[in-house]
Design a protein with these regions (language model features):
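PLP-dependent class I/II
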Residues: 1-119
Length: 119
C-alpha cells in the first residue's frame, strides 16, 4: 500500500517564524514579470494557455492530443512540464513560472524550437 507523508499542521519552528513575517507585504511583481514574459512568447509561438488569476503556473494546451507524449518530447529541450491528465484536463500541461526571470528568458528559445517541431 502507498503511504503519503506530509504535514498535518505547520511544524513548531514554522509557526514561530511566521509570527515575524505575517505583516510583511507580499511582492508578487516578480511572478507578474515572469508570467508576462512567458505568456507573450508562448502566444507568439502558437501555444494556447489559460491566463492565471493568482497562481504561479499556467495551463497550456499541448501541441498534440497526448500531453504525456508532449511533455516527454519537451524534455529533449530540457523543459519541464507536468501533463495535466491527472488534474482532469487531458491534452494540457502545467507550467510553473516561480523561477528566476533569467530562467524564463533562457527557456524561450527551447519553447519555440519545440513548437517548430509541430509545424
Amino acid at each position: 500500500a502507498a503511504r503519503t507523508l506530509g504535514f498535518v499542521c505547520a511544524p513548531a519552528l514554522f509557526q514561530r517564524v511566521i509570527i515575524d513575517c505575517i505583516d510583511e507585504p507580499s511582492d508578487v511583481e516578480a511572478y507578474a514579470r515572469n508570467r508576462t514574459a512567458l505568456t507573450d512568447a508562448l502566444a507568439e509561438y502558437g501555444y494556447t494557455y489559460v491566463e492565471p488569476d493568482g497562481a504561479f503556473y499556467l495551463w497550456v494546451k499541448a501541441l498534440e492530443p497526448d500531453a504525456n507524449a508532449f511533455c516527454e518530447r519537451a524534455k529533449k529541450y530540457e523543459l519541464l512540464a507536468v501533463p495535466s491528465d491527472s488534474f482532469g484536463m487531458p491534452g494540457w500541461f502545467r507550467l510553473g513560472y516561480c523561477v528566476s526571470y533569467e530562467t524564463i528568458v533562457n527557456s524561450l528559445p527551447a519553447w519555440k524550437q519545440l513548437a517548430d517541431e509541430y509545424r
